[in-house]
Amino acid sequence: MATIKDVARLAGVSTTTVSHVINKTRFVAEATQEKVMKAVDELNYAPSAVARSLKCNTTRTIGMLVTQSTNLFFSEVIDGVESYCYRQGYTLILCNTGGIYEKQRDYIRMLAEKRVDGILVMCSDLTEELREMLDKHADIPKVIMDWGPISSQADKIIDNSEEGGYLATKYLIDNGHTKIACLSGHFEKAACQERIQGFKRAMKEANITLNNEWILEGNFECDTAVMAADKIASWQDRPTAVFCFNDTMALGLMSRLQQLGLRIPEDISVIGYDNIELAEYFSPPLTTIHQPKRRVGKNAFEILLERIKDKEHDKRVFEMHPELVVRDTVKKIN
């Protein structure tokens, strides 16, 4: 097995130079980099991660806790994180928790044992139990990427769900809709509570009376959207528009309503939330609230790198602002 000395000898440079090229820890002339990397390829040299971590006190690995990586919103954020990890020479360890505390606890312990340089947390709800578990590992830099209370030991990115809920509802109202239903995720989720607050604020500003029976609880997946569509279609006095708290439910709702013979948006308008890639290509293309998912991933990784370099820095909170994306699923009725 080739060693760093073999690489240095073949490239005609010092072992220190080889180390800087491989670890990207100092500027090295491009011609020298090419010689070193050519020698690395010829010798099939692979640096020892264990030796490097002992010497540099870093493993160049990042852990990421997510509720479910197959969720289209999460997957686009993860893609952004992974891309920037790769560019910076970091390895990403992805931990799917399913929202189960025992898995969250075990993964955090495993990441601590692996001496990861930092942890990104993107769970569908940051419970008090999970917050306490994260705070027990205060020595590991962390960024909380979405919902839940602000951890005393972590930086946080806030998605401003209340603002997004307000924007979606106001757009429906501006297009003449007063009979508006909303399909939420689980009511106890912080993001859902905030989006409902935004929904209610827009309705109150427009002096529109709320029908609490039209605030439906889902689970951010298609199955509950199908059940909600069946319920809405069965009502004699139906809403003219539905605000869905994510695009997955919006697309599921639209599909089922169309199966039941209701046209979108002629018979009922729909607005979603997240602006996942699929939303643009559905028929009709979905009007929605955009969250900058890949930028969230990039910013979270950059913030975490800053925290890794300066663990004593004051805790930071960064805000992201949702934006309306107008497509073809909202009918103007005034």
Curated annotation (Swiss-Prot):
The keyword Transcription regulation applies. It holds the Pfam family LacI. Keywords: DNA-binding, Purine biosynthesis, Repressor, Transcription, Transcription regulation. Residues 4-23, 48-56 bind DNA. One of its GO terms (molecular function) is transcription cis-regulatory region binding. One of its GO terms (biological process) is negative regulation of DNA-templated transcription. Hypoxanthine binds at residues 73, 189, 220, 274. The keyword Repressor applies. PROSITE patterns: HTH_LACI_1, HTH_LACI_2. Pathway: Purine metabolism; purine nucleotide biosynthesis [regulation]. It comes from the Bacteria. Residues 2-56 form the HTH lacI-type domain. Is the main repressor of the genes involved in the de novo synthesis of purine nucleotides, regulating purB, purC, purEK, purF, purHD, purL, purMN and guaBA expression. PurR is allosterically activated to bind its cognate DNA by binding the purine corepressors, hypoxanthine or guanine, thereby effecting transcription repression. Consists of two structural and functional domains: an N-terminal DNA-binding domain, approximately the first 60 residues, and a larger C-terminal domain, approximately 280 residues, which imparts the function of corepressor binding and oligomerization. Homodimer. This is HTH-type transcriptional repressor PurR. It comes from Vibrio vulnificus (strain YJ016). The lineage of its organism: Bacteria, Pseudomonadati, Pseudomonadota, Gammaproteobacteria, Vibrionales.
